[in-house]
């Protein structure tokens, strides 16, 4: 009976540790996506002025000579 109890406790600790690791990976991915979305809310779309403080949105490049975002 003691051996069965030890095996059960060991198995439950392994399952809990695996679940916790997956939970942290999900949180890290969510934080990364939130930061990416935050950056895109401060960006300049195509045809708008781009600066050091307001870079072009994803998919656009800043023409530093004229300071305009373009494809």
Swiss-Prot record:
Expressed by the venom duct. GO terms for cellular component: extracellular region. Residues 1-17 form the signal peptide. GO terms for molecular function: ion channel inhibitor activity; toxin activity. Residues 18-41 form a propeptide. Keywords: Disulfide bond, Knottin, Secreted, Signal, Toxin. The keyword rRNA processing does not apply. Disulfide bonds join 43-57, 50-62, 56-69. Belongs to the conotoxin O1 superfamily. This is Conotoxin LvVIB. It comes from Conus lividus. The presence of a 'disulfide through disulfide knot' structurally defines this protein as a knottin. Pfam families: Conotoxin (PF02950). It is found in: Secreted. The lineage of its organism: Eukaryota, Metazoa, Spiralia, Lophotrochozoa, Mollusca.
């Amino acid at each position: 009976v003691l051996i069965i109890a030890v095996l059960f406790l060991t198995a439950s600790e392994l399952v809990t540790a695996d679940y916790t690791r997956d939970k942290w990976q999900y949180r890290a991915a969510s934080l990364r996506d939130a930061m990416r979305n935050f950056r895109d809310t401060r960006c300049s779309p195509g045809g708008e002025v781009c600066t050091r403080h307001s870079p072009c949105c994803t998919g656009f490049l800043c023409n530093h000579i004229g300071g305009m975002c373009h494809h």
